[in-house]
């Protein structure tokens, strides 16, 4: 009688544990990859944006060192660029082409890899000076090349004059 009662009690506990295991999803099923968490942040940026077009991930900086806890905020840095897709279409940004001369934003903050908690703290700022810096670099490079050519010609003339007076 005692063994039947113990067996019945053990059976109930086994059933409860089985039900609990089925109801609570595993932690690995809830964890996102670093890239997935960043893509979720880009989606959130598009949801909260009042701009006409969607943004798409352009560049993702290296992920931080591995951390076993998906709920721990991870530092993140990435760049997004404006696409040709209008926001109201809600097309997945990955399917949209980048807009020529579209806006580029540098985003920094923290994400978690936990799908349930999902706290994001991301700030994005438009990179306005990229075109200006590029033009300035090209201008200085061109001027430097021209200056170098002039100095070379002056040096050659000095050498020619030196040879002329020595002969």
Swiss-Prot record:
It comes from Sus scrofa (Pig). One of its GO terms (molecular function) is lipopolysaccharide binding. InterPro entries: Cathelicidin-like, Cathelicidin_CS, Cystatin_sf. Residues 1-29 form the signal peptide. Disulfide bonds join 85-96, 107-124. Keywords: Antibiotic, Antimicrobial, Disulfide bond, Secreted, Signal. Transmembrane segments: none annotated. This is Antibacterial peptide PMAP-37.
């Amino acid at each position: 009688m005692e063994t039947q009662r113990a067996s019945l009690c053990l059976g109930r506990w086994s059933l409860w544990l089985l039900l609990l295991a089925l109801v609570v999803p595993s932690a690995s099923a809830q964890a996102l990859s670093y890239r997935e968490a960043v893509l979720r942040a880009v989606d959130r940026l598009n949801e909260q944006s009042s701009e006409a077009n969607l943004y798409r991930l352009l560049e993702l900086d290296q992920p931080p060192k591995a951390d076993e806890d998906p709920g721990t905020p991870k530092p993140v840095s990435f760049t997004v660029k404006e696409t040709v897709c209008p926001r109201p279409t809600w097309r997945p940004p990955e399917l949209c082409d980048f807009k020529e001369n579209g806006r580029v934003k540098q985003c920094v903050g923290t994400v978690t890899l936990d799908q349930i908690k999902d706290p994001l703290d991301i700030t994005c700022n438009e990179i306005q000076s990229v075109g200006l810096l590029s033009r300035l670099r090209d201008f200085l490079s061109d001027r430097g090349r021209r200056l170098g050519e002039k100095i070379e010609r002056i040096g050659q003339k000095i050498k020619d004059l030196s040879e002329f007076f020595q002969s």
